[in-house]
Design a protein with these regions (language model features):
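A conserved beta-strand element that flanks and buttresses the S-adenosyl-L-methionine
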Residues: 122
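Class I SAM-dependent methyltransferase SAM/SAH-binding core
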Residues: 57, 63-111
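Conserved S-adenosyl-L-methionine
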Residues: 213-225
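A short glycine-rich, Lys/Arg-flanked "PGG" loop and its adjoining helix->strand segment in the class I
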Residues: 134-146
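Short conserved loop adjoining the S-adenosyl-L-methionine
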Residues: 112-116
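Conserved class I S-adenosyl-L-methionine
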Residues: 1-52, 148-178, 222-224, 239
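Short alpha-helix
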Residues: 195-212
Length: 253
């Protein structure tokens, strides 16, 4: 789930996500390990992807949460990520689940996908990490027939979201609850990422249009939100809940 914000910074970003790899799945929403949330994501994938068997490129695959779900549904998946550490976890899980024949991994930038064609290009919570999201989306258009983005309004500067984030952070410190990541994402890096802090999904839809994809449509993932809220202990599910969306588009009109 990684991409460098500028030329020369890739080592720094790769190191961040490599350091995150060993503990990343400790957060249930990262690993999609909660049975209810897993079922909600399985339904979301089934509705957005073409019928299996089909070839899937999972950009920013991370530890393979989405790749493995897709493989379970019968898809042949190629996982792409900048971090070797994250992909090592994905490969380990694929082997443990008996899915190694359906999931293969490649280390590389999200903006430089492997040669296609793929029936569908998917990503989950990745666009915010990319310094040129329109350019990346355009590169995916070169290798994919359909685009499926699973996104949310992360890091919103809205007052209500910031207030909830502040309350959750303070409460986690009091309760000594481990954070979602090994360290905060560097602020100077965030400043270079156009989609890092979104008040709404409008910039996401605009980026897809600008990249040249056709027939763009969007739907709120209310079942995923509901499932994620339920598996978190109160009040974290409420404090940390954010709107999530699936955006689908096609290479040809």
């Amino acid at each position: 789930m990684t991409d460098p914000p500028a030329v020369g910074a890739s080592d720094r970003i790769r190191e961040f996500w490599d350091a995150d790899a060993s503990t990343y799945d400790a957060t249930k929403s990262h690993s999609i390990s909660d049975p209810l949330e897993r079922a909600a994501w399985r339904q979301a994938l089934s509705e957005a992807l073409p019928h299996p068997p089909a070839s899937v490129l999972d950009v920013g695959a991370g530890t393979g949460s989405l790749s493995l779900l897709a493989a379970e549904l019968g898809y042949a998946v190629r996982g792409l990520d900048l971090s070797p550490g994250m992909l090592a976890e994905a490969e380990r899980k694929a082997n443990a689940m008996g899915l190694a024949d359906r999931v293969t991994c490649a280390v590389g930038s999200a903006s430089e996908p492997p040669p296609g064609p793929f029936d569908v290009v998917v990503e989950r919570h990745v666009l915010w990490t990319i310094p040129d999201p329109v350019g990346a989306l355009r590169s995916w258009l070169d290798v994919g027939r359909r685009l499926v983005l699973f996104e949310g309004t992360w890091g919103s500067r809205r007052l209500d979201h910031r207030t909830k984030e502040f309350a959750a952070e303070k409460l986690r410190k009091v309760m000594r609850t481990p954070p979602d990541h090994h360290a905060p994402y560097p602020e100077d890096v965030l400043a270079e990422l156009p989609l890092a802090r979104l008040p709404s999904p409008v910039p996401l839809v605009e980026a897809v249009h600008q990249a040249g994809w056709h027939g763009v449509r969007i739907r709120r993932l209310r079942d995923v939100e509901w499932a994620a809220r339920l598996h978190e202990p109160w009040p974290f599910g409420w404090l940390e809940e954010r709107p999530r969306y699936v955006i689908v588009a096609d290479a040809e009109s």
